[in-house]
């Protein structure tokens, strides 16, 4: 088995291949390894380690050199300050004391560090074990897990083996053998099969026999295909010579992500050129793709771009991921993803790559339905050309001569696009082909950019061949100084390293090396001469100690500039290259930032030269050979010294009279000259510099050096104010919406003219102004405040009848057709809107809902069991909660029709037995946690005059009761498991929400009286369709069960008690009998913490109550004894019982047998004995009057010991007296 091969064998193969000089030797050793050690059925386990960059079965490791160095340091257990740790972290840097000869090669430096800790003996790691560990490494979600895997690898390998493991992780073995050579040696058809499947495992499994040719496989939907590529060409004439005599189409080369879209029904994949599936595009694009691609199966080849709706054009490259993330998070933006399809590879069930490009263009127009700004088609006739803005060039044309190509290329470059692609219309689509059927022409290939003189201020160490020495430079532009003064500040501009030969680079480095200063960020700041961002991508390894010691470089780039976030300069360059080293130029003559910005603005955001010699493109070789000997005839005159020519401008109005404008920056949609002419047309003047005569500073955005300078001196106004004034031909007031920056003086003055929402006291609002004011008003997030104002401001019932409802909609579509499901969806949308209009809320979270409304067609029967099957186990438990009403849509329809919230019981879908089982479980639990007191009969209703006012200061916390309690052997109690730090639940109807709220004592007193319980099933108010009204006493009430307190919260009184009773303030624990007119149904339990009754009752009432309660308890015990053997006991000391036992010493206690209850209930111990006065407690005279009654009846099975009745009337007085 290949899996059992030691990894050391594969390491030997790597070493042999790396040492071999010729390609044939490398290939023969690879072939010998396969024939000797590998079985055909197990090729993949070894090949995936030889070319790891093509293995897509294993996910990304998420480890580059810097992170991998940190993980290795942790895995080895060495300090970050140790020399070996510093070498790993600074692997790029040179110096024999640190990195040595291996500087720039991370795997070799890691091997040196590991060699002193691992030794040379192999750990016996097999290929299978290595693959398993690499799978674990790829699936690890945090650095700690990755470190653990690396530690295991270190234990099972030696330093030489670990070096190759690190290279496999970095997916760069540096064997000097291309994947093309490996495929050719593995099987003659391997490369072709991989190009159409991008599946290395499939290649290894299908091509086991090297001598058996494989039938050429066509592309399939769902499997990535290597894209056809364009050959680079540097000259229009050279490109035309290769395509002469053929039908050629010229297309704009878009600057985006090359993406293949695979559609199979509703299953959409977005494969990149590296055959990675970019699922991040799915949220923004998948629905659009499904609706606008008119076939079920299809493969499109195209470019994913960003469309700017405000500018009506494509945005600059680099924001795809940002826009995809914004769409995924539901953020509004004026930018959106747009896919431009320029080829189709698969239609229906057939591959069309063998058809000509012209035929594929016709298919593309039939298959894709274009949607402006979202899904476009790039074809010569129609498609994207139809949607282009007026005045802009076409995106795709058929060319017939080199002049047509030249003209199209210039138009594309002026439009700031990436370049053009020339395609043979008769060519077929070839996966991975770069033979010249497609050719690309980009501006940097023909030196269309201007040469810029910049100053070196820092350096970066290289890797690989240039490891250990500075190979790239950080260059800067000067901040313009005053006349006849050298610049004192330099702003970071870009990073450049290509363009020089090794000798030229070594010469520059040797001249600067004496002035290198190590960058010790963050310990030491950069030299004060340099203005930098300290961005990680900007931060150099070394600084140039002083600008006077530095050298000027002449650099060129793509003609397009990009707005910089990494560097201080407002613009940076794309693909910069060093043209030559300017030893002849002193350091202070480098280009300044202001001149560069004006150059960019004057050339519409590019660095294009004003006039390019035609011979440059006709004969690029001559230009290249003579570029160093001849001085370029390029003039970079700062445009701020050149006034806009306004001699032919005629005045239209005088709205800007006596005003002088200075434009800090302008939008891309307008040029600086346009604004200058606009100001002059309306009677104003403009200045090219910011001086004291300027009255208005205008800007398009709050960024850039010029903006920072302007805002230090005066207010900065948005350019839209100028446009609005000109469009309306009148001077508009400077409202807050027009300001980009306000000085302190202007801000103070403006506060007298506007309110807190920026609404002016003196000017009327238009529609746009009203929208702005409303957007400035903060929205309240307090739901209670919102409900209060809704009731106050919308007193009509139709706007507030569902104010307290939160509705969760469930579509019941068990046997519906597609059309009926669509109608059900429309019904759901209508009801959602009506709920919102009626003041209710709609939620997608069942835990937040108060009503689950089941939507169904009129004739469809509803089944609660089928409804519950659609939910998770946690949600099923919520469905049984009484607080959640499961109703049909008729309840909602009729409530909306009558403009009032109807009782839910009539419309409930939850079967009564399910609802009762939920409440019944609560009753059983409470029944078992209740030990019947000697006085337990149902009490008659107290008159209103018996209400006793007790302040909240008398309330005792549960903690205090526990401290005063005394442990007892009879106080066995069955309790539910606690969840975290939450108290155990006593009743099944109790909810999590009830544990978190508190209310005033008056609310608690009224709620306790209203929610009394009864033990008898016949006495439970469960009639359907009638809602019990709060505030009314119930008829035929029996003993009341009171639950133990939780912390400072009031105890819950019964299983049917509403959830509102859980929200009582625990500090106000007063007697429930103190309520007005709600004293019925009270009893006291030995184990529960409750306040004693204060009202006095006659002895005859007590005897009647005792008989009734004991009869109910006896019947309940006899009926449930056989089911009560399922749960374990947990000994729990009841606070009130312990307190009573401490107050009344018991001469003798009789242990009672406990009876097991049904699952989920509590076990209770019956306590017998007499309660006498305690000498230790020194009670007052009322304690001596405590009555001791006869014992209770005993249970039948198991027998219960009779217990004596204890009157708690006097005990209550004693307890309250202590308080």
Curated annotation (Swiss-Prot):
Residues 1084-1096, 1117-1126 have a biased composition (Basic and acidic residues). Its EC number is 6.5.1.1. The keyword Nucleus applies. One of its GO terms (molecular function) is DNA ligase (ATP) activity. SMART domains: BRCT. Residues 651-739, 807-909 form the BRCT domain. This is DNA ligase 4. It comes from Arabidopsis thaliana (Mouse-ear cress). The gene is LIG4.
């Amino acid at each position: 088995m290949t899996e059992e091969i030691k990894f050391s064998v594969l390491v030997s193969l790597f070493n042999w291949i790396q040492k071999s000089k010729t390609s044939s030797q490398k290939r023969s050793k690879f072939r010998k390894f396969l024939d000797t050690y590998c079985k055909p059925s197990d090729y993949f386990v070894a090949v995936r380690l030889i070319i790891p960059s093509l293995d897509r079965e294993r996910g990304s490791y998420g480890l580059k050199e810097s992170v991998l160095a940190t993980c290795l340091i942790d895995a080895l257990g060495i300090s970050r300050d140790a020399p070996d740790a510093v070498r790993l972290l600074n692997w790029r840097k040179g110096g024999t004391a640190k990195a040595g000869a291996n500087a720039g090669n991370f795997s070799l430096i890691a091997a040196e560090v590991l060699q002193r800790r691992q030794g040379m003996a192999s750990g016996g790691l097999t290929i299978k074990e290595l693959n398993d560990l690499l799978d674990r490494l790829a699936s690890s979600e945090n650095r700690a897990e990755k470190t653990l895997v690396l530690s295991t690898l270190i234990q099972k390998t030696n330093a030489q083996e670990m070096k190759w493991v690190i290279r496999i992780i970095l997916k760069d073995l540096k064997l000097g053998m291309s994947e093309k050579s490996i495929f050719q040696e593995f099987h003659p058809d391997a490369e072709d099969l991989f190009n159409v499947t991008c599946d290395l495992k499939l290649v290894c499994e299908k091509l086991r026999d090297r001598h058996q040719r494989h039938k050429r496989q066509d592309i399939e939907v769902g499997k990535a295909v290597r894209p056809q590529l364009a050959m680079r060409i540097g000259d229009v004439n050279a490109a035309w010579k290769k395509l002469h005599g053929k039908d050629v189409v010229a297309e704009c080369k878009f600057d985006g992500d090359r993406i293949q879209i695979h559609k199979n029904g509703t299953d959409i994949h977005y494969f990149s050129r590296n055959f990675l599936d970019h699922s991040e595009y799915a949220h923004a694009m998948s629905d659009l793709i499904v609706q606008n691609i008119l076939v079920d199966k299809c493969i499109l080849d195209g470019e994913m771009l960003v469309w700017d709706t405000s500018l009506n054009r494509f945005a600059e490259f680099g924001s795809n991921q940002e826009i995809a993330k914004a769409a995924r998070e539901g953020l509004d933006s004026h930018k959106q993803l747009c896919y431009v399809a320029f080829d189709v590879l698969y239609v229906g069930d057939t591959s069309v790559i063998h058809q000509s490009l012209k035929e594929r263009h016709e298919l593309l127009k039939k298959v894709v339905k274009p949607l402006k700004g979202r899904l476009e088609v790039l074809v010569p006739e129609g498609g994207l050309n139809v949607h282009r803005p007026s005045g802009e060039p076409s995106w795709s044309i058929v060319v017939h001569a080199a002049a047509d190509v030249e003209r199209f290329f210039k138009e594309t470059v002026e439009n700031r696009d990436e370049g053009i692609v020339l395609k043979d219309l008769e060519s077929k689509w070839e996966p991975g082909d770069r033979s010249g059927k497609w050719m690309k022409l980009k501006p940097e290939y023909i030196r269309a950019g201007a040469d810029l003189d910049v100053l070196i201020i820092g350096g970066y160490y290289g890797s690989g061949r240039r490891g250990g020495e500075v190979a790239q430079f950080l260059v800067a532009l000067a901040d313009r100084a005053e006349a006849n003064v050298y610049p004192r500040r330099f702003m970071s501009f870009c990073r450049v390293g290509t363009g020089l030969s090794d000798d030229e680079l070594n010469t520059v480095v040797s001249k600067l090396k004496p002035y290198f200063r190590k960058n010790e960020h963050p310990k030491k700041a950069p030299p004060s001469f340099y203005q930098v961002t300290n961005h990680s991508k900007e931060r150099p390894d070394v600084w140039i100690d002083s600008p006077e010691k530095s050298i000027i470089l002449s650099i060129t780039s793509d003609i397009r500039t990009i707005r910089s976030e990494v560097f201080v300069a407002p613009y940076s360059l794309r693909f910069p290259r060093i043209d030559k080293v300017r030893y002849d130029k002193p350091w202070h003559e480098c280009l300044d930032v202001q001149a560069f910005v004006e150059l960019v603005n004057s050339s519409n955001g590019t660095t294009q030269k004003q006039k390019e010699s035609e011979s440059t493109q006709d004969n690029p070789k001559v230009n290249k050979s003579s570029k160093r000997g001849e001085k370029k005839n390029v003039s970079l005159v700062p445009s701020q010294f050149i006034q806009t020519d306004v001699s032919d401008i005629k005045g239209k109005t005088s709205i800007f009279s006596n005003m002088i404008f200075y434009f800090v920056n302008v939008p891309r949609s307008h040029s600086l000259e346009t604004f200058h002419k606009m100001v002059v047309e309306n009677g104003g003047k403009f200045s090219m510099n910011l001086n004291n005569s300027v009255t208005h500073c205008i800007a398009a955005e709050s960024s850039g050096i010029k903006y920072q300078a302007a805002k230090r001196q005066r207010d900065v106004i948005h350019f839209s104010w100028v446009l609005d004034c000109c469009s309306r031909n009148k001077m508009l007031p400077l409202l807050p919406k027009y300001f980009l920056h306000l000085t302190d003086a202007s801000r103070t003055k403006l506060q007298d003219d506007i309110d807190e929402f920026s609404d002016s006291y003196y000017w009327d609002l238009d529609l746009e102004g009203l929208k702005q004011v409303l957007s400035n008003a903060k929205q309240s997030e307090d739901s209670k405040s919102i409900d209060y104002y809704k009731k106050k401001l919308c007193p009509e019932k139709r706007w507030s009848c569902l104010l307290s409802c939160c509705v969760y909609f469930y579509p019941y579509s068990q046997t519906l057709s597609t059309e009926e499901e669509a109608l059900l969806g429309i019904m759901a949308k209508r009801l959602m809107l009506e709920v919102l209009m009626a003041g209710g809320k709609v939620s997608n979270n069942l835990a937040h809902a108060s009503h689950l409304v089941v939507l169904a067609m009129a004739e469809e029967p509803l089944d609660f069991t089928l409804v519950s099957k659609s939910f998770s186990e946690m949600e099923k438990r919520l469905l049984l909660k009484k607080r959640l009403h499961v109703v049909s849509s008729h309840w909602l329809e009729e409530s909306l029709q009558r403009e009032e919230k109807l009782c839910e019981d009539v419309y409930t879908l939850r079967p009564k037995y399910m609802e009762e089982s939920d409440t019944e479980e609560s009753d059983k639990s409470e029944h078992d946690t209740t030990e019947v007191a000697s006085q337990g009969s149902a009490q008659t209703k107290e008159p209103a005059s018996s209400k006793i006012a007790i302040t909240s200061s008398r309330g005792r916390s549960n903690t205090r009761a526990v401290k005063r309690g005394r442990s007892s052997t009879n106080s066995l109690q069955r309790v539910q498991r606690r969840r975290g730090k939450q108290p155990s639940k006593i009743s099944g109807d109790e909810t999590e929400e009830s544990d978190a709220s508190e209310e005033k004592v008056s609310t608690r007193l009224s709620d306790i009286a209203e929610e009394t319980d009864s033990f008898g099933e016949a006495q439970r108010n469960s009639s359907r369709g009638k809602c019990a009204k709060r505030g009314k006493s119930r008829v035929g009430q029996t003993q009341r069960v009171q639950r133990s307190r939780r912390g400072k919260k009031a105890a819950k009184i019964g299983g049917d008690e509403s959830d509102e009773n859980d929200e009582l303030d625990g500090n106000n624990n007063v007697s429930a009998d103190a309520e007005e007119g709600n004293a019925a149904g009270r009893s006291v339990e030995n184990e529960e913490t409750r306040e004693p009754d204060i009202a006095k009752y006659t002895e005859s009432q007590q005897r009647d109550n005792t008989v009734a309660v004991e009869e109910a308890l006896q019947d309940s015990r006899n009926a449930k004894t056989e089911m009560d053997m399922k749960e374990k006991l947990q000994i729990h000391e009841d606070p009130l019982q312990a307190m009573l036992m401490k107050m009344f010493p018991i001469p003798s206690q009789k242990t009672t047998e406990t009876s097991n209850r049904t699952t989920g209930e509590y076990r209770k111990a019956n306590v017998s004995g007499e309660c006498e006065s305690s000498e230790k407690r020194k009670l007052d005279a009322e304690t001596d009057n405590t009555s001791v009654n006869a014992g209770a009846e005993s249970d039948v099975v198991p027998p219960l010991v009779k217990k004596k009745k204890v009157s708690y009337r006097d005990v209550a007085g004693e307890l309250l007296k202590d308080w």
